[in-house]
């Protein structure tokens, strides 16, 4: 795994303040993975650090590389995290809620940066998010998870236009609408703990369409259309 982690697969965490080491300069933290995976002279790697910081939008990159994490704003710290993630040009970049702690304006800038860098470098991005707005903007294909299990998979347009799983429908119904005066949708009940997942379909205690068999039979992913599947006993019936 040591040869894969950071080189073939890299990760951006949701809280840069907790992910960056407060006692090391950001440039040294960028260097860490490159020293391990890239066979280049030290001087070349340090030049690459400055180049990466500039690429992710850090002004005065050569100077800021010598600064510590507490000297960066939340948005700039997240840009540093993106720089660390792309430093070895991985095949897969996992972004775990990369904009959670940011205000809306900075969030849009960081996501636009992530999208443009992924396209420019040819890196696949696995985005973990609970924000359907971000998912609609960033993703091509979506996997919906509930209680640790995949309950639906489809391209992003299908997920929003024709969701097949009741949980996915419930999530989309919770989105605020600009037209009309209908009450905001909610999903009844609470998410089960991973040590107390219900038998059968894990969503059945909260599902408005649940049948008796839903409490007994665990559904597997089944076809709900072209390149579309859902783990629901009612799909295809």
Which residues does each predicted region cover?
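Conserved ABC ATPase signature
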Residues: 67-72, 76
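Hydrophobic anchor residue at the start of the ABC signature
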Residues: 30, 82, 106, 110
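ABC-type ATPase nucleotide-binding domains, specifically the catalytic core motifs of the NBD
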Residues: 1, 25-44, 54-59, 71, ...
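Short catalytic/signature loops enriched in Gly
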Residues: 59-65, 153-237
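P-loop NTP-binding/switch modules centered on Walker-like glycine-rich loops
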Residues: 2, 94-98, 102-182
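ABC ATPase NBD coupling module
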Residues: 1-10, 28, 36, 157-163, ...
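A short, proline-enriched helix->beta-strand linker immediately N-terminal to the Walker B motif
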Residues: 87-91
